[in-house]
Amino acid sequence: YDVHLSPHLACYVDDVIDARKHNQVEHFTIPDDGFVLRPGQTYLGSTLEYTETRRFVPFLEGKSSVGRLGIDIHATAGKGDVGFCNHWTLEISVSQPVRVYAQMPIGQLIYFLVEGEVEVDYSNKASAKYNQRSSLPVESMMWKNAF
């Protein structure tokens, strides 16, 4: 299942990101003539598509054409949770400057059927941090963990 880049991007405001703090992001829209992503910057993007995965485990991978442009679309979060219902936030980085456009093909979702009963899916999980529906990229909620 192909997914596309939404027109929404975000970047962290501070130069140093603190895992124990709620780091603020600045949201912006990709203009019609595209936006140049730069190395050394983490960009948060989102998929144009809203997905629900009640009986499936979703895996997100970048399209090979995207990888060949030097674009990574997720840092570590390629596997989703059963019960995740939202747009996917993408953790985008590039190896060299690359101009991207809203609605360009960005990735592929692969679904694996869950066998057996799901006791508690993500949408009902007490510790779920990304249940607030939004078409905008969502910043890290690591600060909500106790450590």
Predicted region positions:
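DUTPase catalytic domain/fold
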Residues: Y1-F147
